[in-house]
Amino acid sequence: MSVTLHTTSGDIKIELYVDDAPKACENFLALCASDYYNGCIFHRNIKDFMVQTGDPTHSGKGGESIWGGPFEDEFVSALKHDSRGCVSMANNGPDSNRSQFFITYAKQAHLDMKYTLFGKVIDGFDTLEEIETIKVDNKYRPLVQQKIQNVTIHANPMAAD
């Protein structure tokens, strides 16, 4: 299963780890399907670290899960933040996942087993690079606003019904 984020900078295609992070993927896919992420800005952009989005309030403090509250972390020891393009739930402590997520710009081993890793970028690394190079203010907010315009969900024909 995969999705494509259509952003103001271009497309980013993400493969989802539905078997390893089923709850995070269910939440993410349902939010994508309901157009929840449409218009969400990339509100935090730290070169060589990560870019964060998924907050419809644009404050970096908002967002809800499909269950209306936080949901638990899903950690798999084999899944590591070991490269550019890891996609994880943002949180503010254990079991506080909602709607915000981030994409890494490089290996970030210190995030392992602290943030639910639920996917990886498989196409659109040029778009990710373009976003990474955008100038930011002192709070890491892009000076030129970048956002998710809409999302395409791609069905996996090999997946069981």
Curated annotation (Swiss-Prot):
GO terms for biological process: protein folding. Its EC number is 5.2.1.8. Signal peptide: none annotated. Pfam families: Pro_isomerase (PF00160). One of its GO terms (molecular function) is peptidyl-prolyl cis-trans isomerase activity. PROSITE patterns: CSA_PPIASE_1 (PS00170), CSA_PPIASE_2 (PS50072). It catalyses: [protein]-peptidylproline (omega=180) = [protein]-peptidylproline (omega=0). GO terms for cellular component: catalytic step 2 spliceosome. Residues 1-153 form the PPIase cyclophilin-type domain. PPIases accelerate the folding of proteins. It catalyzes the cis-trans isomerization of proline imidic peptide bonds in oligopeptides. Belongs to the cyclophilin-type PPIase family. PPIL3 subfamily. This is Peptidyl-prolyl cis-trans isomerase 10.
